[in-house]
Regions:
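Hydrophobic transmembrane alpha-helices and their immediate loop junctions
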Residues: 1-142
Length: 142
């Protein structure tokens, strides 16, 4: 395992601990967080949730974009490695530059699409204001 993988894993562990702290805060503040009044403290918690709890889902979606594109174009031994706050896809195959471009771009394309869906959801879904802020914040991060 390379040094960069170890440092990425260490950061994921640290972020995971902050994520656990965020869950603890959310449980403690659930009644005020989910009421109809959005405070500055609620917004701080929204950003913590968006980054430390939802970002791993965005990373997974990003890597899945690479994975499915590689599978679609006939790569062999395609493997998705999700490490929480980072990940990578490995595969074997020889591709022309345009196919490689598509496989490489599939991850960011999925992330962008997910972000736009979150923004749209924040606008059109009939949900509480705090959940609108959460969707919009995650969409911004994507």
């Amino acid at each position: 395992m390379s040094d960069s993988m170890l440092s990425g894993d260490a950061i994921s562990i640290l972020y995971g601990l902050v994520g656990l702290f965020t869950i603890f805060r959310l449980v403690q503040q659930r009644s005020s967080f989910f009421d109809r009044i959005v405070t500055e403290e609620d917004m701080h918690l929204v950003w913590l949730i968006a980054f430390f709890l939802l970002t791993p889902l965005g990373v997974l979606a990003h890597e899945a974009g690479h994975y499915f594109a590689a599978e679609y174009y006939g790569a062999t031994n395609v493997e998705l490695n999700h490490r929480g706050y980072w990940g990578f896809v490995t595969y074997y195959g020889t591709f022309d530059s345009s196919t490689q471009f598509i496989i490489t771009g599939a991850g960011p394309l999925i992330g962008t699409a997910l972000g736009l869906v979150c923004f749209a959801g924040a606008i059109v879904l009939p949900i509480r204001m705090i959940l609108r802020h959460l969707l919009a914040s995650f969409g911004f991060l994507e």
